[in-house]
């Protein structure tokens, strides 16, 4: 009894089986491996033969395994069998001559064994075969330079340059010449470099070189030549001109106390380059003027140049409305007087475009900006009203109109307490435009904000009468009545909408009608609408599926709805709802079967199966599987006498019906024979 454990509480430190296994694995001892001893040349030859057979066997199974080739060659090198190693490398290159790591390993092995000529031959072969692989060229030039063969290195670089390589190759060539103080050669290379890569980075690199190896005049010549070249490439434009080139030149002049030269360069850049491409240049110029000039001087210079640029552009194309917008914004931001800004506005709106609505869109926004500026910034209410009137008078309303202008004018009058005038404006707009949908919507939204719902109804009556073929006005009208709590009026509007003989996208109205009845908890009415829609669409498959899915969402009469955090009702699917949905699926199945719509039945089966996966049990799933169609390939004869294959479906229930019908027919024949 004394040996019995009295404290049966769990130990403070619990050890799991996983910990035991992990500790055992970590403490396992490495098995001793017997070192293979080779006693004589015969054993060595046998060992080498065996290893070669292993490598050759592996390569016969997979010749494309480049790693295996290189391991084979490395092993031969370890055996000091250089001829065999070369043979392995050559065979590997025959399999894949474009594999760069194989070339590099082959070359490195030759260099390691000090077989210089072999390595040179390999490098020459490699760059001849793969002239676009920079790594091979870099290896080649590094080898020649390491060997002290500068002339040979230069010759390799020249061969490389004929292929117009990337900028890193040119930079390496220039740096090589700089290391040996061959500045004239480096300068010649840079001339060719900017020809092949004529961007701003190349010119900056050349200018930086001249700062180290040349003098001020040569630096200026390089910068000037670079800017002239880039401008000429763009046929006098600035598409290729980069702010870094101008900023670098200006910084160079600043370091040498040539402040006027630097200021001229900054001014030139800000004048020529667009704002999106001159942010750094402007920042540098600001810092320059803070240190060496006056802030007012900067702003005046920049604004003057900008205005000059806009004026030049507008002389070429007075109808460039984007430039007019930029010009007006510049005037507002620079603090021009109101009369000066008004003059720019008047000049802009005087350029009336031809009667093309595409061109008029930007033009109309000039008028809108003008009117808003007069009203809100200048507080000139009468002037703003005159602008709206003038704008309306010049629009060719017989061809097109702009609902936005009418609505903004009406809102302007409302802001200034003139509601009757606003209604007159919108009524006039509807009359002159023939009733644009956007104008109807804006007018109705305005009256709704004012809580004038009777006026909204009158407007909707005209709206749906004018655009009876559109679904949107009908749905918006019904939603208004639903919001006002008039269920009967909303239902009447929906019924009138679905009775329209022609309508674009009528399915939207039907869908919203069903949702309306569901929201009002009139589920029997919703079912009746589905039946009506099935008659209208001749039993369309999508309607059947939607009908079945709807039944799942219908709660039981005594069911209490639960609401989530977002206020949405969460309905628990009852067995009664599942039964109703299955009934609809079954009815749809029979209807499609009677109409011989096989493909639609397949779609219905997939939807039914998804329903059963989510809501069904084993029995319902098994019952549905009995209906599963089987795809079969069949042939049919075309009009030209040829045959084509197509996929048909065989339904098990159809085959059972055929078998049962045949059984009844045989029974009838047997009965007739017995009676006779």
Curated annotation (Swiss-Prot):
It is found in: Nucleus. One of its GO terms (cellular component) is Prp19 complex. Pfam families: HAT_Syf1_CNRKL1_C (PF23231), HAT_Syf1_CNRKL1_N (PF23233). It comes from the Eukaryota. Residues 616-636 are annotated as: Disordered. HAT repeats lie at residues 46-78, 80-112, 114-146, 148-179, 181-212, 215-255, 257-291, 301-333, 336-369, 379-415, 417-449, 451-483, 485-519, 521-553, 576-614, 620-652. Residues 616-628 have a biased composition (Basic and acidic residues). Involved in pre-mRNA splicing and cell cycle progression. Required for the spliceosome assembly and initiation of the DNA replication. Associated with the spliceosome. This is Pre-mRNA-splicing factor CLF1.
């Amino acid at each position: 009894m004394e040996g019995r454990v009295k404290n049966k509480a769990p130990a403070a430190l619990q050890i799991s089986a996983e910990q035991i296994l992990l500790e055992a694995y970590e403490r396992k001892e490495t098995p001793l491996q017997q070192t293979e001893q080779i006693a004589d040349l015969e054993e060595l030859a046998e060992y080498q033969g065996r290893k070669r057979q292993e490598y050759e066997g592996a390569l016969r199974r997979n010749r494309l395994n480049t790693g295996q080739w290189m391991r084979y060659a490395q092993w031969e090198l370890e055996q000091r069998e250089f001829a065999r190693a070369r043979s392995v490398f050559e065979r590997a290159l025959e399999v894949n001559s474009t594999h760069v790591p194989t070339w590099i390993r082959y070359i490195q092995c030759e260099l390691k064994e000090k077989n210089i000529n072999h390595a040179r031959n390999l490098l020459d072969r490699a760059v001849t075969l793969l002239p676009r692989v920079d790594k091979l060229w870099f290896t080649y030039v590094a080898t020649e330079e390491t060997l002290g063969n500068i002339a040979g290195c230069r010759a390799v670089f020249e061969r490389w340059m004929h292929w117009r390589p990337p900028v890193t190759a040119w930079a390496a060539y220039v740096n090589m010449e700089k290391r040996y103080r061959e500045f004239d050669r480096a300068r010649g290379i840079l001339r060719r470099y900017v020809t092949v890569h004529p961007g701003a980075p190349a010119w900056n690199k050349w200018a930086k070189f001249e700062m180290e190896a040349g003098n001020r005049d040569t630096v200026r010549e390089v910068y000037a030549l670079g800017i002239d070249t880039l401008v000429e490439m763009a046929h006098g434009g600035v598409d290729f001109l980069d702010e870094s080139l101008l900023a670098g030149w200006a910084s160079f002049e600043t370091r040498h106390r040539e402040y006027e030269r630097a200021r001229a360069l900054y001014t030139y850049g800000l004048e020529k380059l667009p704002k999106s491409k001159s942010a750094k240049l402007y920042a540098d110029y600001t810092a320059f003027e803070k240190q060496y000039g006056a802030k007012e001087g900067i702003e005046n210079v920049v604004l003057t140049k900008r205005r000059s640029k806009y004026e030049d552009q507008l002389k070429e194309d007075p109808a460039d409305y984007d430039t007019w917008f930029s010009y007006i914004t510049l005037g507002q931001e620079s603090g021009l007087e109101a009369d000066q800004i008004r003059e720019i506005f008047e000049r802009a709106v005087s350029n009336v475009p031809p009667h093309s609505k595409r061109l008029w869109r930007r033009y109309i926004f000039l008028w809108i900006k003008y009117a808003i500026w007069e009203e809100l910034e200048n507080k000139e209410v009468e002037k703003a009203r005159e602008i709206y009137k003038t704008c309306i008078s010049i629009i060719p309303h017989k061809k097109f109109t702009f609902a936005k202008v009418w609505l903004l004018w009406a809102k302007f009058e409302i802001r200034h307490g003139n509601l009757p005038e606003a209604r007159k404006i919108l009524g006039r707009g509807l009359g002159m435009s023939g009733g644009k949908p956007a104008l109807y919507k804006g007018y109705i939204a305005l009256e709704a904000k004012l809580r004038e719902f009777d006026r909204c109804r009158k407007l909707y009556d005209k709206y749906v009468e004018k655009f009876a073929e559109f679904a949107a006005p009908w749905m918006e009208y019904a939603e208004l009545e639903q919001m006002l709590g008039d269920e009967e009026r909303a239902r009447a509007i929906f019924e009138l909408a679905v009775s329209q003989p022609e309508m674009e996208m009528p399915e939207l109205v039907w869908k919203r009608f069903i949702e309306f009845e569901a929201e009002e908890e009139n589920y029997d009415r919703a079912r009746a609408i589905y039946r009506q829609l099935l008659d209208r669409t001749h039993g369309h498959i999508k309607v059947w599926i939607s009908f079945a899915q709807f039944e799942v969402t219908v709660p039981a009469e005594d069911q209490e709805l639960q609401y989530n955090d977002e206020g949405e009702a969460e309905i628990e699917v009852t067995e009664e709802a599942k039964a109703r949905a299955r009934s609809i699926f079954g009815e749809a199945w029979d209807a499609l079967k009677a109409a011989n719509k096989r493909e639609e039945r397949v779609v219905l089966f997939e939807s039914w199966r998804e329903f059963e996966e989510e809501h069904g049990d084993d029995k319902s799933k098994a019952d549905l599987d009995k209906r599963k169609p089987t795809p079969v390939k069949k042939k049919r004869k075309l009009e030209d006498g040829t045959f084509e294959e197509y996929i048909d479906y065989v339904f098990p229930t159809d085959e059972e019906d055929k078998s049962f019908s045949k059984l009844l027919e045989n029974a009838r024949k047997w009965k007739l024979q017995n009676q006779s």
